[in-house]
UniProtKB/Swiss-Prot annotation:
SUPFAM superfamilies: Interleukin 8-like chemokines (SSF54117). The lineage of its organism: Eukaryota, Metazoa, Chordata, Craniata, Vertebrata. This is C-C motif chemokine 4. CDD domains: Chemokine_CC. Monokine with inflammatory and chemokinetic properties. GO terms for molecular function: chemokine activity. One of its GO terms (cellular component) is extracellular space. The gene is Ccl4.
Length: 92
């Protein structure tokens, strides 16, 4: 009887620790960063080191430029200079 109670207790303890890992459906990662506004001016190309696009789960599509100083600047992906910088960074 003691063995059965111990085994059941251990099983419940393991289930309690594992449950939070399975609470979200697979493939439903929340967005890590979203932009709520865009920069109002064009960045100097020499300051931009890299870029990434925000998640499709964000309410506003954006391109985030990473600068030499480590800043992250949100830009409108439909702006011509933004698409030009993205193409340039892809080639280099």
């Amino acid at each position: 009887m003691k063995l059965c109670v111990s085994a059941l207790s251990l099983l419940l303890l393991v289930a309690a620790f594992c449950a939070p890992g399975f609470s979200a459906p697979m493939g439903s990662d929340p967005p890590t960063s979203c932009c709520f506004s865009y920069t109002s001016r064009q960045l100097h190309r020499s300051f931009v080191m890299d870029y990434y696009e925000t998640s499709s789960l964000c309410s506003k599509p954006a391109v985030v430029f990473l600068t030499k100083r480590g800043r992250q600047i949100c830009a409108n992906p439909s702006e011509p200079w933004v698409t030009e910088y993205m193409s340039d960074l892809e080639l280099n």
